[in-house]
From Swiss-Prot:
GO BP terms: photosynthesis
Entry membrane topology: Single-pass membrane protein
Location of the protein in the cell: Plastid, Chloroplast thylakoid membrane
Pfam entry (one): PsbJ
Classification via PANTHER family: PHOTOSYSTEM II REACTION CENTER PROTEIN J
Name the record gives this protein: Photosystem II reaction center protein J
Length: 40
């Protein structure tokens, strides 16, 4: 990790974005599967 001040590393952005997307999809599918399909 060399001098990434002022710029966010691309791998960090990808990791955070991927985690958020997977989390949202997981919550959505879990809600739909549990019968709480009105979670939109």
């Amino acid at each position: 990790m060399t001098n990434t001040t002022g710029r966010v590393p691309l791998w960090l952005v990808g990791t955070v974005a991927g985690t958020l997307v997977i989390g949202l999809l997981g919550v959505f599918f879990y809600g739909a599967y549990s019968g709480l399909g009105s979670s939109l």
